[in-house]
Structure formats: structure tokens, C-alpha cells
Amino acid sequence: MSKRNQVSYVRPAEPAFLARFKERVGYKEGPTVETKRIQPQLPEEDGDHSDKEDEQPQVVVLKKGDLSAEEVMKIKAEIKAARADEEPPSADGRIMYRKPVKRSSDEKHSGLSASSKKKKTKEEDEINKQDSVKKNSQKQIKNSSLLSFDNEDENE
């Protein structure tokens, strides 16, 4: 059992004719398992790859309400400040979960709200009832102004 743990792979020496052939062709050795285990040090960037001055989009102001270049720069600065305020990711690479911030009742009703099908049908029924009551009262008013055959009978 202990001999299994001591097994290792020894790469044999490359034959001379293969070494000469690779040298003539200019063959470059691919990554090995050991080189893949080493993580390269990437330069740290803010993630703003297109923020170089010559790569920024052109700002065109067509109307009075359009954003100007200065306003765009202010907004970008605010976004960067907001990112800086956030907690940096932990060094050990673990994902941290936080509870969501509770909203006030005003904010709950101001946005889109989901409701159940029962509530929707109840609300629709109430609206339909109100509409039918209005229509019935209008029909009664219209009925009184419609032609009547009783008047003709009385005239004869």
C-alpha cells in the first residue's frame, strides 16, 4: 500500500534526432502540468479598459437636455467612488453574502409590484361592476328619450 504513494513519473530524455528537428522547425514547447499550476501575475486594472483618452466615445450634444462631456466625467467619478466604498473581496476568495437592505413602504408601492391572480380577478370584478352600474344608469336615461309608441296611440 505504501509503494503506491511513492510512484512518480520520470520523463525520458528526448532523442537527438527529435531535438534537432524541433530546433530547425522552431518548435516551441507547450505548457506542461507544472507550468499550468503556476498562476501568472496579471497587472491590476480598474476594469476600465476603454477609459483611455483616445478611446473614449465622442460626446455630441444635440439638445439642451443632453449630457455634456463634463457631466459624463462627473457621473463616472461618482461610479468609481461608489465602487471604492464597497468592501473589497476577501483575500481568500470566498464569496460573502449579505442580507438585502429593507425598503420602506413608500418604495415598495412606487415601483413595479407583483400581485396574485386572485387579487387581479377581484379588482377586475369590482371595476366591471362599477362599469356595469354606470352603463345601466345610462341605458335608463337613454330609454326615456327613445321613441315611444304610446304617444302615437294616444294621438289617434
Swiss-Prot record:
UniProt keywords (A-Z) are: Acetylation, Phosphoprotein
UniProt-listed PANTHER family:
GEO02494P1
Q: Segment Disordered: which positions?
A: 22-64, 81-156
Parts of the chain that traverse the membrane: none
In which organism is this protein found? Bos taurus
Q: What is this protein called?
A: Uncharacterized protein KIAA1143 homolog
Q: Where is the composition biased (Basic and acidic residues)?
A: 121-134
Against InterPro entries, the record matches this protein to: DUF4604, KIAA1143-like
In this UniProt entry, the residues modified to Phosphoserine are S50, S148
Give the domain of life.
Eukaryota
Acidic residues bias locations: 43-56
UniProt xrefs under Pfam families: DUF4604
Q: Which residues carry this modification: N6-acetyllysine?
A: K108
